[in-house]
């Protein structure tokens, strides 16, 4: 209710300034740190017990500034990042565009972040607070050895992470998506799976929606072979459906409502290709309870939101979690785990 009143003022700001405002507000607001505790929503993925399956996707809290405030809003987990070894400014501004008529966002941020030292200091300071925190890592744009960057980041962030995500699917770092190719992916996973050590947190992989069937099959096969913790499906798309907003032709990754059909189909593709052998995290165009329920029934053990928060506000996580509780009761299910892949 409150967000609907202040949304016009927030949306009058430049999108990047509005995002910064939201981070600063979360730092300052006296938020009630009550987490949704319906036991029927608890789900175990890669050995981690998630209190509910609704999380914040990477990209919102790039520098690990407000993970605990987000958990206090009712999210079951928060994925911070993407974080790179060295600080980088990202691409020139403007680089973030709000497509209000399409309930979408286009970004070409380019892994802008304060770097590993800053993130590590913040994550170390809050480590005793608990909660499920994923850390999404990337490579510096000018790196001579991107696989080494990923291995370094996984090793450095492992002590503070519930899980680690190798983000090789951003369209805004030239050549990054080439790491999804079969040979490169095998080398990457060999490096990052070894980096955290035998007792380290599980490693997830975030993939693009813009994949051919052969790519899906190859990624699924390698992920199973390497014992990946989960696949996050999917990142933003470079494709452009029929959009109505003024900034529809800006370059970058498209997220929000127009991504939903593609992200849902790609999730189903990976569910089929993996045969349920690896947990899936559904992300892309999830804005409602029905969206989350559909993604879970299509095979997602967890779901993540980000762009929808631009339009629905910070209460979205708690709203979806409560709605999923109702869905379980309506379908006579005792646990959200019963709903996974039940379509």
From Swiss-Prot:
Pfam family, one: DHO_dh
Enzyme Commission identifier(s): 1.3.5.2
Pathway assigned in UniProt: Pyrimidine metabolism; UMP biosynthesis via de novo pathway; orotate from (S)-dihydroorotate (quinone route): step 1/1
Cofactor binding comment, as recorded: Binds 1 FMN per subunit.
Cellular compartment(s): Cell membrane
Binding positions for FMN per the UniProt entry: 58-62, 82, 136, 167, 206, 234, 256, 285, 306-307
PROSITE patterns the UniProt entry points to: DHODEHASE_1, DHODEHASE_2
Binding site for substrate: 62, 107-111, 167, 172, 235-236
Tree of life domain: Bacteria
GO biological process, one term: 'de novo' UMP biosynthetic process
UniProt enzyme class: oxidoreductase
Reactions accelerated catalytically: (S)-dihydroorotate + a quinone = orotate + a quinol
Quaternary state and interactors: Monomer.
PANTHER family (alphabetical): DIHYDROOROTATE DEHYDROGENASE (QUINONE), MITOCHONDRIAL, DIHYDROOROTATE DEHYDROGENASE (QUINONE), MITOCHONDRIAL-RELATED
Function: Catalyzes the conversion of dihydroorotate to orotate with quinone as electron acceptor.
Protein name in the entry: Dihydroorotate dehydrogenase (quinone)
Protein source organism: Erythrobacter litoralis (strain HTCC2594)
Protein encoded by which gene: pyrD
